UniProtKB/Swiss-Prot annotation:
One of its GO terms (cellular component) is cytosol. This is Triosephosphate isomerase. One of its GO terms (molecular function) is triose-phosphate isomerase activity. Keywords: Cytoplasm, Gluconeogenesis, Glycolysis, Isomerase.
């Protein structure tokens, strides 16, 4: 299975100059790294998700490369246009060249109180505009301590289950247009990292749950996110249940980001 490594830049970098510098560093490093050459790019798909403000510029810069560009969110209220101050629609995102979007990140759930109903609307709009969706799920520290990881995952994956129930016509496309990113909230940016065996078992549960929704979802891509870095990427990449990584802070430096990409490129061989 092809691996995926996705850099979620969040609200970074601060300036267009810094974005250009990061892109130049990233593209130069990719072109000079044998394992990341065009001939080997099918082993690991690289994608970056800049802020809305930089999305068009980054998408344009990456147009003739193997690196994909994603948004970090889409509007829940309209797939196209409307009086929704501050929102960007899926159509607008697709129009500037992005082909994917992240949805359901824990920071969006926490700071913007995003519910399952909201996420269902966003996912519907994204798929309507032919955007792929990286759907983030994961438990908090309190839920982990209470051994509620699997029930929490069930409740969050209910968005996918409801999507299929309400729009069965999308089922066949989800195997290539939906990626699940398991990000335990307590591990994001904290330096705390679950064991590889814990992540592997959780990924197996996610895959089994999705397969229960529809036979065509039996081989879904499931990524891990949460303090993934150059030092621990090899151990995650070696596990067949872990198909890649959603990377936060480590994606803001080309060297550390590409070390993770290289690890998963080797792991998918």
């Amino acid at each position: 299975m092809q691996a995926w490594v996705i850099g979620n830049w969040k609200q970074n970098p601060a300036t267009s100059h810094d974005v250009d510098a990061l892109l130049n560093e990233l593209c130069t490093a990719i072109s000079t790294t044998k394992q990341l050459s065009h001939n080997n790019s099918t082993r690991c798909q690289i994608m970056v998700a800049p802020s809305f403000l930089h999305l068009a510029a980054v998408s344009s810069r990456l147009k003739d490369t193997s690196v994909l560009c994603a948004a970090q969110d889409v509007s829940a209220y309209s797939a196209s246009v409307g009086a929704y101050t501050g929102d960007c629609s899926a159509q607008q995102i697709a129009d500037v060249g992005a082909t994917w979007t992240i949805l359901g990140h824990s920071e969006r759930r926490q700071y913007h109180q995003e519910s399952n109903d909201t996420l269902l609307q966003k996912m519907t709009h994204a798929l309507t505009q032919e955007l792929g969706v990286v759907f983030c799920i994961g438990e908090t520290q309190a839920q982990y301590d209470a051994k509620q990881t699997l029930p929490v995952i069930d409740s969050q994956l209910a968005v996918v289950k409801k999507l299929i129930a309400e729009q069965p016509e999308v089922i066949d496309s989800l195997s290539t247009r939906l990626i699940i990113a398991y990000e335990p909230v307590w591990a994001i940016g904290t330096g705390k990292v679950p064991t590889v065996s814990e992540v592997s078992a959780t990924h197996q549960y996610i895959k089994q749950t999705l397969a229960g929704f529809a036979d065509s979802l039996s081989n879904m891509t499931v990524l891990y996110g949460g303090s993934v870095n150059a030092d621990n990427a090899d151990s995650f990449a070696a596990d067949p249940m872990i198909h890649g990584a959603l990377v936060g802070g480590a994606s803001l430096k080309a060297e550390s980001f590409l070390a993770i990409v290289t690890a998963f490129s080797k792991g998918s061989m």
